[in-house]
Amino acid sequence: VREERLKTTAGLRGTPALPLSAWRGHSGRRYVVGVHPAGGFDLDEMAEAVVIAVRRDDTGIAEMVSVATSNESPRDHLRRTWLDRVRRSGATELHVHRLAEGEAERAAIVSDLRFDTIEPAQV
């Protein structure tokens, strides 16, 4: 499992484009993600998405801290707890994948990206 950085161009009308990246899972599948700073992350961004908490080493290489999925029902306390935990673990970025068709596909993506951990798969 590894990150593959993507080059982005300016958005429409010259606005900055959302930083994009991709993660390659154990299966070889690639998952494109939007990159968000962990500090000001909005909990609503986690709804119906796969979220990868990331920290970078001194050379800029991404290290996955945790990966989880969240369904559409609001579970703000659990989401906030997960966010607090990954921030304390050094996560500075949250990579959000929104292209999964439903909860089963999001769970499969988490399994594909997951490393051996006791972290919950869903928050």
Outline where the language-model segments fall.
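GIY-YIG nuclease catalytic motif and its immediate N-terminal context
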Residues: 1-82, 103-123
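Structured alpha-helical
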Residues: 100
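Aromatic- and Lys/Arg-enriched surface recognition patch
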Residues: 75-96
